[in-house]
């Protein structure tokens, strides 16, 4: 995904994590140094391929994510001009692996966590939530995940999903950096021009 973003934003340098766990990166001795040298910190995590719909595991996982985002905000609060892009959690795909009652409880828990993220982003202007759940609804559940990617590279998403996530991250970065694009409007019969000026 970073290769796609780097291709779109030419003047951007990306530092990849030394670890494959969010906790390890946040609590590493190099975290603050990396954060001070960065304008953006991108934290993505997904629940659908890891926890097999166990309510207690999902609850524990979401609590851990809550603590992670709070810790990141705490550790970066004295750093100027850093934006944290944090992925929300997509709702579960189906209830095949659990009871209907348990499935509904899990969905409510995930919705509550996503609301927590939105409220936290309102209080912390440097926290930007990337709505992965909305992307899943747009792309479709069947096209969103690719389990073989998870086993190959711990990336649960399909190629098309990676492209969409890259595009969304790029839009956020461009907006925050105020990157302007030139736009040529060809409107030979003046049907669009009034709306463009408005």
Language-model regions, residue ranges each:
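Extracellular glycan-modifying ectodomains
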Residues: 1-186, 191-198
